[in-house]
């Protein structure tokens, strides 16, 4: 085009030389190299392992896709943020344009994301009525600040949205994600990895886990998505279903979305002593939304994974 407009090829070369640095080349899933150097080595699963009359596995192709994504989104300097509305602490999200009542008799958007604990996402052309809900804990790229709204791009669902300021926690400029936890709903397993170089990742643990099950009105599935580790509790107290009475506690709990935690084997009242392992781990979904682990593995994650700097991928 420049040549056609009468600018010489030499001038173009000069222009090309002085333009800002070229965009870094995207890393493909095929380029990702994974080695194993376990920091936690109890109940370790093989890459493929027997389960009842079938086999289960760690889905390396999907894991590599997500690791490549995590590297690629960080190639250009970005301000990162987290969508936050745990227990509606930042205010109940307004009603979306089109909504329904789900199996739990709660309001949800047309994609099934519940209003409770979620964040309203507004189209860039309409800040009066939200279009859909964003899940608590979701990783977003922070694009622009405003008086009442900020512009963000959630990494999992994509596109650009306006969100009222109070629902977005902005992370420090220095934030860099090199630790990640992969939770597999299909095969009921969990893996921790950390980055050791460009396109190079090291597995730190690979273990059985149990995710949330769809069982209204109390138990629900662990949400799929890309989340940031938000907080930790040495003991997460839980209530008996449908009651305000304490049901017990889950040890070494690391929260990533809504009331979803990665935690150890639950301890029911009146017992107080920790339970290390349960034979149900790695079998079928059975928790309320949380990701249940051997208690020593949940403690490993609790100690190893920094808050606001660890990415949790929930995949299927």
Give the positions of each predicted feature.
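Solvent-exposed, polar/charged alpha-helical surfaces in well-ordered, non-transmembrane soluble domains
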Residues: 135-138, 188, 296-303
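SH3/SH3-like (including bacterial SH3b) beta-barrel domains
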Residues: 124-134, 202
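Short, flexible surface segments
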Residues: 136, 223-224, 307-308
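Exported/periplasmic cell-wall-interacting domains
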Residues: 26-34, 38-40, 45-46, 51-53, ...
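Gly/Pro-biased beta-strand-loop elements
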Residues: 164-273
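Short, structured beta-strand/loop micro-motifs enriched in basic residues and often containing a Trp
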Residues: 115-126, 288-295
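SH3/SH3-like beta-barrel superfamily modules
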Residues: 14, 20-93, 131-166
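Short beta-strand/loop turn elements enriched in aromatics
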Residues: 93-117, 268, 272-283
